[in-house]
C-alpha cells in the first residue's frame, strides 16, 4: 500500500503540494548559474578572437549573432583535417566543419551560408567552449598554433 495518498493531478504519482518556495529558489539558482556561465563563455570567445588576430594564417569566420561557445576558424593554406590531428597530439580536440555537417563529407551548409568556398571549408575547424574551459587553455591552444607553420605542409598557397 502507498505511503501517501493523493496526487491525482499528477497521475497519482506525486501526492501532496509542491514546495513553491523551494521551486522558486531552485529556478533563481539556475538562472544565476546560467548568467554566470554565459558571461564566462563570452569572455572566452572574446579572448580567443583577440588572440587569433595575432596570426596571419588564422581567420575567424564567426560573426554577428552567434553562440558564444562555438567559433569557426580557418587556417589559411592548411587542411583542417591535418591541423585537427596536429592539435590532437597536444591533447587539444576540435572538430572539422560545422556541427550541422559533422557526419557528412559534403561542404558544410553553415560555412556555405557564410559565403565560404571549398578551400575555406577544407581549411576550417570548429572550436567549442565549455563553462569549465579557461583563458589559460586558449593561450595554450595558440601556443601550439605558433608551431603549425614549422610542422605542417601548406596545401594551398
Where are these regions (language model features)?
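Pyridoxal 5′-phosphate
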Residues: 1-157
